[in-house]
Every structure is written in C-alpha cells, then in structure tokens.
Regions:
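Outer-membrane beta-barrel porins/channels
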Residues: 1-211
Length: 211
C-alpha cells in the first residue's frame, strides 16, 4: 500500500519578506504486509514500511528525511464471532535527516516515532461488525498517553460496505466495494472521508488484492 499526505499552496517568501513561488510539503509511506495463519485460531502478521518526508526550504531546494519501520501483530480467535488482537506499532520507525547540504553547519540526526502498544477486539452483531482498540503510546522509555479507537461496518449483498468510526482525534465515514478480478472476492476498493476537531478534512482511497 502507498499512503500520501501533504500540504500544497504554501506561500514562499524571500528574506526581504517579498513573495516567491508556491511550495508544498508531503509525507509518503510504502507498506508491504505479510500474514500467516499458524493454527486455526491464531495468526501472525507484520508490516515493513519505507518512509519519506519532504520539507520545502527555498523555491528550488527541499530537505528530505527518510527511514524504515516495522509493525508486528497477533490475531487470536476467541469465539465464533469474536477475535482479539495484540499489536506493536512503529518498531524502530524514524526519519533520518541530513541538513549539511542546506545549512553550512548542518548535521545528521534522527527523528524517532513513538512506539504504540495496542490491544483490541472485534465482534459481529447480526451483520454489524464492531471493532475497538486502545493504544498505549510510549516515547520508548516513558509512557506518553492513551489512544482509544472505535469503528463499525455493515455489509450489504456481501459486496458493498458502509463504515464509520472515531480515532486519533478524527471522525470518519467510508464505503467499500469488493469484487472478483481473478477469483471471487479477491479485490477491494475502499474510500474514506475523515475530519478532525479543527475541521481539517482528508480523503483516502485504497486498493487491496488477496492471493
């Protein structure tokens, strides 16, 4: 999967205060996911992430930070319609910056992501899937905060899906469409609209192929 987020139409200015060109900044993540069922009631999964962050410095120069990260998780089936999940997110995730080419006294440094420990559960109530989890955010050595999340999904004709949820300070609504490309139900297209408390909005489109 590829995830992109950024801001465009940033008004650049010269040192005198006069306007220069329009600039933009962006973050990109490419994620490769693997999962394996070990026993009928337990599965293991992992994400490998390639990260990149571009910051505008001048009209023609940008400062780029890049790095890698990992997520691991275990999924346990606790009943016919219930599952329990445990996950560790952003293991060793970081941006590494080199400002030597931008500033005469620049240096190499690393921005490390907080590591998040999550535990959650899912249940199916007459076709309505309810998912919730709670995350413990740590600054590697110390506890920082608690992050709760809740989501619901309703399937129609085993092909169309309607979703809603709250998490990370954002409320979201979405749609999903499942179809067969090479075999039945092997492809998924999903769209989500989200908004935070400051009324900042985001649109996310994703595609998944199962094999």
């Amino acid at each position: 999967a590829w995830v992109n987020s950024g801001v465009t139409n940033i008004q650049g200015r010269y040192s005198t205060g006069m306007k220069s060109s329009q600039m933009q900044t962006g973050e990109n993540a490419i994620m490769i996911t693997f999962a394996q069922r070990i026993l009928p009631w337990i599965s293991f999964g992992a994400n490998f992430k390639i990260l990149r962050h571009d910051l505008p410095i001048t009209e023609s120069d940008q400062l780029t930070g890049s790095g890698i990260g990992f997520d691991i998780g275990v999924l346990i089936k606790t009943g016919q319609f219930n599952t329990l999940g445990i996950m560790v997110q952003d293991i060793s995730s970081n941006y590494q910056w080199d400002t030597g080419d931008v500033y005469a006294e620049g240096r190499l440094y690393k921005d490390e992501f907080p590591t998040i420990y999550r535990i959650g559960s899912r249940t199916n109530i007459k076709g309505l899937i309810v998912v919730g989890d709670i995350g413990l955010i740590t600054n590697h050595d110390t506890f920082a905060s608690v992050l709760p999340r809740l989501g619901v999904e309703y399937g129609f004709l085993d092909q169309y899906y309607f979703r809603g949820g709250y998490g990370n300070g954002r409320t979201a609504f979405g749609l999903g469409y499942e179809y067969g490309l090479f075999k039945a139900h092997d492809s998924h297209i999903d769209y989500a609209f989200s908004m935070d408390w400051t009324a900042q909005t985001a649109h996310t489109i994703s595609y998944a192929f199962s094999f």
